């Protein structure tokens, strides 16, 4: 009987050369299903989230849905496209497009486009485009563009473009541009274009195009094109093009004007130094001894730069 079955199968395949094996049919149907299946989208159903706590709400937390209106004590959502208001805070797994307000904190895993207001902190895992106001700290993982105001510190992992106002600190991991005010310090890891004003310290990791102003010290590791004004010192690690005003001004190369008690350049000066002591590696220090009616002996020093003494 088994032999007859095998023989019948062989004859059927010979008379039907277009027939295919069952596994071939299954693979073909799977390919056809893949072609017919619509591409996956992250934009799922839209709903209203009235929430007391995570998973105690009118909208369950998933990975595809989005929320158009959120009101609660503490809320957890996938995506917010609209308005969210919470007494304590909210956690959004992906992006926010709209307005978020919370008594304590707003946390967004993706990008924020719109306005955030929180009593303590706003945290965005990716980018921020818009306005962020927090009582203590505003944190953006990558780019921040817009207006950021925090009572303590604003921190951007990458580029910061716009107006950043921090009670103590503004920190940008890469470059920054715009207007930065801080009660203590402005720190930019890359280039800075614009105005940086700090109560104590302003530090730029690469080049400055604009103005630095601080009560204590301005430091630019690369070139400076613009103006530096400080109560104690201005330091430029490359070429200073423009104006330096401070108790001490130092640059590798100076092209412009240095005004201070002590002015120094290392390699080249194309400009003018106005100060009590103007120095460079070629400056000659000459000691002077002299006497008078009031004092029998006086000792002084003068610094000679080419044809000028200070």
Question: What is the predicted function of each stretch?
Answer:
Residues 1-19:
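Bacterial Sec-dependent N-terminal signal peptides
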Residues 17-310:
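Surface-exposed, glycine- and small/polar-enriched segments that build interaction surfaces at terminal
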């Amino acid at each position: 009987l088994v032999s007859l079955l095998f023989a019948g199968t062989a004859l059927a395949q010979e008379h039907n050369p277009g027939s295919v094996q069952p596994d071939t049919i299954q693979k073909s149907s799977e390919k056809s299903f893949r072609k017919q299946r619509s591409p996956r989208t992250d934009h799922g159903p839209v709903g209203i989230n009235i929430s007391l706590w995570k998973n105690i709400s009118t909208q369950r937390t998933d990975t595809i849905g989005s929320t158009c209106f959120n009101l609660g004590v503490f809320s957890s959502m996938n995506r917010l496209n609209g308005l969210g208001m919470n007494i304590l805070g909210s956690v959004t797994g992906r992006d926010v497009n709209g307005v978020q307000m919370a008594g304590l904190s707003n946390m967004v895993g993706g990008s924020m486009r719109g306005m955030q207001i929180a009593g303590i902190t706003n945290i965005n895992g990716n980018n921020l485009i818009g306005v962020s106001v927090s009582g203590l700290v505003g944190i953006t993982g990558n780019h921040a563009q817009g207006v950021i105001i925090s009572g303590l510190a604003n921190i951007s992992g990458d580029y910061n473009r716009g107006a950043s106002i921090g009670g103590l600190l503004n920190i940008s991991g890469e470059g920054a541009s715009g207007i930065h005010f801080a009660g203590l310090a402005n720190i930019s890891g890359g280039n800075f274009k614009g105005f940086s004003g700090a109560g104590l310290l302003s530090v730029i990791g690469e080049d400055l195009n604009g103005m630095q102003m601080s009560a204590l010290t301005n430091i630019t590791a690369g070139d400076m094109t613009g103006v530096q004004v400080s109560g104690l010192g201005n330091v430029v690690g490359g070429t200073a093009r423009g104006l330096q005003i401070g108790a001490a001004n130092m640059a590798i190369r100076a092209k412009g004007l240095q005004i201070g008690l002590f002015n120094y350049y290392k390699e080249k000066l194309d400009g003018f130094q106005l100060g009590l002591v103007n120095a460079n590696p070629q400056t000659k220090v000459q000691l002077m001894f002299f006497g008078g009616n009031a004092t029998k002996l006086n000792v002084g020093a003068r610094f000679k730069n080419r044809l000028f003494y200070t």
